[in-house]
């Protein structure tokens, strides 16, 4: 089985410089949804590109065969551009890059039906308002498809539509393609004409509107996004996740969340994030591509491409940037930013700190206002803080620098040299007190 994805269209009605198939749906380009599903049912996958072909090609996996349709002259013309992909002894599944939610189950039903002996198998649906769609007309055991623009008045009441999804016998398709003409209202080469040439046609029906909805406008894309969002929320609710306000919660379809986790309002969980069991996430929190363990609490914070182990507390108002690893039972508090750093088990950084390019050991106390000065104007430098160290408030650690095990840094210090284990590090001017100075100054005035 081969699958050919037609994705050459510009998407004029999207009013965008971005190719239509690259617009995201639940965090992934539309065409990525189609390629993934195609790869589950077919041994080879090909894609026909057109508008901004090179840009779309970069978004495709390397194992996909790519063909280019220089001028968009219809669906049959697109398939002709990939003629070398079609093998006489193999079946071909036709999919579309802007119809992203076609299901694996439906495609398997089509393939199974086709293998009962057909030149072509069509996926059809019945719509209350079929306007704009080609109609599937049955005459005994024969079927033909008429495009909406070419439909005679007496057939406009037919509600069975052609979804555009087909399985063709490779032998039949190679014979039919040269016979297709562009004698229609739009002057295009329609793949539906190949169906009309077929002697053996089989039909599979779907009643799932989502999987046959094509995206031609941003309005449709937003509608699909909302339907997919609610499907995901319903799935999570059924699997033991509490979502306090579904109306303000946005969770991408690829996200995994464990049971007894509570999601508070205004929370966004995106990408390939995985959240463990018995967590509290939100409110007003955004999580992107993170691995989160069990019993984690994150509130009013942002976390990007980070790993958060069990029993960790984050926030409020913390920011975890890419490359952050928070070990078990660590605590990150308000207005703390961490970038490309590992925070050891039981370590606390609870107030107003920046930790970047650092390796912090176990049970370290990072005092309020601590800054790792990692950038020297040319490159980023590392800071090492070993187990059990105590960093006093308002300290600046000028990297590269190492704070030894159990060392103590006095509050307000600027540390520019390594501090050995169990040592006191001070880097500040001695306090000066001038008794009675204020009263004396007032008298002078």
Curated annotation (Swiss-Prot):
Cofactor note: Binds 1 Mg(2+) ion per subunit.
Active site: 351 (proton acceptor)
Recorded metabolic or biological pathway in which this protein acts: Nucleotide-sugar biosynthesis; UDP-N-acetyl-alpha-D-glucosamine biosynthesis; N-acetyl-alpha-D-glucosamine 1-phosphate from alpha-D-glucosamine 6-phosphate (route II): step 2/2; Nucleotide-sugar biosynthesis; UDP-N-acetyl-alpha-D-glucosamine biosynthesis; UDP-N-acetyl-alpha-D-glucosamine from N-acetyl-alpha-D-glucosamine 1-phosphate: step 1/1; Bacterial outer membrane biogenesis; LPS lipid A biosynthesis
UniProt entry keywords in alphabetical sequence: Acyltransferase, Cell shape, Cell wall biogenesis/degradation, Cytoplasm, Magnesium, Metal-binding, Multifunctional enzyme, Nucleotidyltransferase, Peptidoglycan synthesis, Repeat, Transferase
GO molecular function: glucosamine-1-phosphate N-acetyltransferase activity; magnesium ion binding; UDP-N-acetylglucosamine diphosphorylase activity
Linker: annotated segments: 219-239
Annotated Pfam families: Hexapep, NTP_transf_3
Region of interest (N-acetyltransferase), residue spans: 240-445
Chain spans, region Pyrophosphorylase: 1-218
Gene3D superfamilies according to UniProt: Hexapeptide repeat proteins (2.160.10.10), Spore Coat Polysaccharide Biosynthesis Protein SpsA, Chain A (3.90.550.10)
Keyword hit for Disulfide bond: no
Binding site for UDP-N-acetyl-alpha-D-glucosamine: 6-9, 20, 69, 74-75, 96-98, 134, 147, 162, 216, 321, 339, 354, 365
UniProt catalytic activity: alpha-D-glucosamine 1-phosphate + acetyl-CoA = N-acetyl-alpha-D-glucosamine 1-phosphate + CoA + H(+); N-acetyl-alpha-D-glucosamine 1-phosphate + UTP + H(+) = UDP-N-acetyl-alpha-D-glucosamine + diphosphate
Compartment list: Cytoplasm
Positions of acetyl-CoA binding: 368, 374-375, 393, 411, 428
Top-rank taxon, per record: Bacteria
Biological-process GO terms, alphabetical: cell morphogenesis; cell wall organization; lipid A biosynthetic process; peptidoglycan biosynthetic process; regulation of cell shape; UDP-N-acetylglucosamine biosynthetic process
Record-listed E.C. numbers: 2.7.7.23, 2.3.1.157
Transmembrane segments: none
Cofactor: Mg(2+)
Binding sites annotated in the UniProt record for Mg(2+): 98, 216
A GO CC term assigned to this protein in UniProt: membrane
Subunit-structure text: Homotrimer.
Known role: Catalyzes the last two sequential reactions in the de novo biosynthetic pathway for UDP-N-acetylglucosamine (UDP-GlcNAc). The C-terminal domain catalyzes the transfer of acetyl group from acetyl coenzyme A to glucosamine-1-phosphate (GlcN-1-P) to produce N-acetylglucosamine-1-phosphate (GlcNAc-1-P), which is converted into UDP-GlcNAc by the transfer of uridine 5-monophosphate (from uridine 5-triphosphate), a reaction catalyzed by the N-terminal domain.
Family under the similarity heading: In the N-terminal section; belongs to the N-acetylglucosamine-1-phosphate uridyltransferase family.
Record-given protein name: Bifunctional protein GlmU
Organism of provenance: Thermotoga maritima (strain ATCC 43589 / DSM 3109 / JCM 10099 / NBRC 100826 / MSB8)
Source species taxonomy: Bacteria, Thermotogati, Thermotogota, Thermotogae, Thermotogales
